From Swiss-Prot:
Pfam families: PTP2. The lineage of its organism: Eukaryota, Fungi, Fungi incertae sedis, Microsporidia, Unikaryonidae. Residues 253-263 have a biased composition (Acidic residues). InterPro entries: PTP2. GO terms for cellular component: polar tube. It comes from the Eukaryota. Keywords: Glycoprotein, Signal, Sporulation. It comes from Encephalitozoon intestinalis (Microsporidian parasite). The keyword Glycoprotein applies. This is Polar tube protein 2. Transmembrane segments: none annotated. It is found in: Spore polar tube. Residues 234-249 have a biased composition (Basic and acidic residues). Residues 1-18 form the signal peptide. Coiled coil: none annotated.
Length: 275
């Protein structure tokens, strides 16, 4: 027994004195979820899961927002169309005369009637006879001027836009005629020569399409307007007797829906009238 213990002690002392150092071991990587020191790495798991959940939530949120925006735009468009059709189906007021019939599905006829109504009833052109000149206006813009010059030395008076003392002294038009953009006479005021006793009204502008040609006396219109135009534009050097000079009549009417009379006359037989 003593011999065995002595052998063991000798071997242990020899191992310590030899100074043998053990090689360092490579560290073992710790993976997510791998137990470490008897405990699971739950903190890393929660962090990675949170990033993934946030990404998925962001994608879902963007998708829901896009769908909600699309649905909102569609509802707004449907509401706008519904409101438009509802208003159009009512049509304008009866006295306005802008719509021929109620248009529920389509509005082409109603819109067309409004355009025609505006074209027929709006005063676009004006012929004004002042002193020795006749002017043609489009709205308030002068686009043509005819001067009845005797031997070329008559002064031309141009009215200014701004009101001044000079404007008050300018001669006023002796006669004026108003035309719509399709050439119909829609208004006239002033003194016009009267060569015949036949009373004739120029055709009134109509606010509807179908009844325009039926209600309009075309012959009367041509006879009245051509005479008015010829007398306003062309200055005739006709020697008249005192009795004939008195045959002037003052007329004024408004063509915009009013029914006031406007007396016209036929061109003279000498053929100088403008047709």
């Amino acid at each position: 027994m003593l011999l065995l213990l002595s052998a063991v002690a000798f071997v242990s002392a020899t191992a310590v004195q030899s100074g043998v150092v053990s090689q360092p071991t490579t560290p073992i990587p710790i993976l997510p979820g791998q137990p470490m020191g008897g405990m699971a790495n739950g903190c890393t798991n929660k962090k990675l899961d949170g990033v993934e959940i946030m990404r998925r939530n962001m994608v879902e949120c963007q998708k829901r927002n896009a769908e909600a925006t699309k649905a909102m735009v569609e509802r707004a468009n449907e509401k706008a169309v519904e409101t438009f059709n509802k208003e159009v189906s009512k049509g304008p007021q009866k006295e306005s005369g802008q719509c021929i019939e109620k248009a529920v599905q389509g509005t082409d006829r109603c819109i067309l009637a409004g355009i025609i109504d505006k074209a027929v009833n709006k005063r676009k052109y004006r012929i004004s006879d002042v002193e020795n000149s006749t002017s043609l206006y489009r709205g308030d813009k002068l686009i043509a001027l005819i001067v009845n010059v005797d031997y070329g030395l008559q002064p031309i008076i141009k009215p200014k836009k701004k009101k001044s003392k000079i404007m008050a002294n300018l001669p006023q038009p002796k006669r004026e005629m108003y035309f719509n953009q399709i050439g119909q006479l829609v208004g006239a005021k002033g003194t016009f020569p009267q060569d015949n006793k036949d009373e004739c009204k120029p055709c009134e502008p109509k606010k509807t399409v179908e009844t325009a040609s039926e209600r309009c006396n075309l012959g009367c219109e041509l006879k009245g307007t051509s005479a008015l135009i010829s007398k306003a534009i062309q200055k005739k050097e006709i020697k008249e007797s005192p009795k004939e000079g008195d045959r002037n009549t003052t007329q004024e009417y408004d063509g915009e829906g009013s029914a006031e009379d406007a007396e016209g006359q036929q061109p003279s037989a000498d053929g100088e009238g403008l047709e």
